[in-house]
Amino acid sequence: MKITLITVGKVKEKYLRDAIAEYSKRLGRYCKLGIVEVADEKTPEHASDGLERQIKAKEGERIAKHIRDDAFVIALAIEGKQLTSEQLAAKINDLGLHGTSHIQLIIGGSLGLDPAILKRADYLLSFSKMTFPHQLMRVILLEQIYRAYKINAGEPYHK
């Protein structure tokens, strides 16, 4: 299975980059992992709704260039479905059993994802009703993907 994260912006903090590298290494046993970073747009402190829509649209265009037609696309969004770790593991397993060979997971920038990306997604996933920094969300998502593979392999880790 190929797993690709499509993310907006670069990870600036070393401790987050280290965690991403660690989970990427661990996942190498289970899947082929790729991470695509698209440029983020500078957002002024008190941006108007119209400007925020424009920023999300620009970031959305950059994301869309990397979405593959043959991939199952999961977008992270507050309005998405919340799953337990076991349910996420089952979702990944079921996708593989039904012939999916590539899953793309999309993490938006500080303003979230453009509606066009949400519409294109095959599945909307939410980790919480709360908002998380998108850089930290990469670590959380990679950890949960790793946990899912450990669950599916019946290996100790997730309890």
Swiss-Prot record:
GO terms for molecular function: rRNA (pseudouridine-N3-)-methyltransferase activity. SUPFAM superfamilies: alpha/beta knot (SSF75217). InterPro entries: Alpha/beta_knot_MTases, RlmH-like, tRNA_m1G_MTases_N. GO terms for cellular component: cytoplasm. Pfam families: SPOUT_MTase (PF02590). Its main location: cytoplasm. Keywords: Cytoplasm, Methyltransferase, rRNA processing, S-adenosyl-L-methionine, Transferase. It catalyses: pseudouridine(1915) in 23S rRNA + S-adenosyl-L-methionine = N(3)-methylpseudouridine(1915) in 23S rRNA + S-adenosyl-L-homocysteine + H(+). It is an enzyme of class 2 (transferase). It is found in: Cytoplasm. Its EC number is 2.1.1.177. The keyword RNA-binding does not apply. S-adenosyl-L-methionine binds at L76, G108, F127, S128, K129, M130, T131, F132. Homodimer. Specifically methylates the pseudouridine at position 1915 (m3Psi1915) in 23S rRNA. PANTHER family: METHYLTRANSFERASE, RIBOSOMAL RNA LARGE SUBUNIT METHYLTRANSFERASE H. Belongs to the RNA methyltransferase RlmH family. This is Ribosomal RNA large subunit methyltransferase H. The lineage of its organism: Bacteria, Bacillati, Actinomycetota, Actinomycetes, Bifidobacteriales.
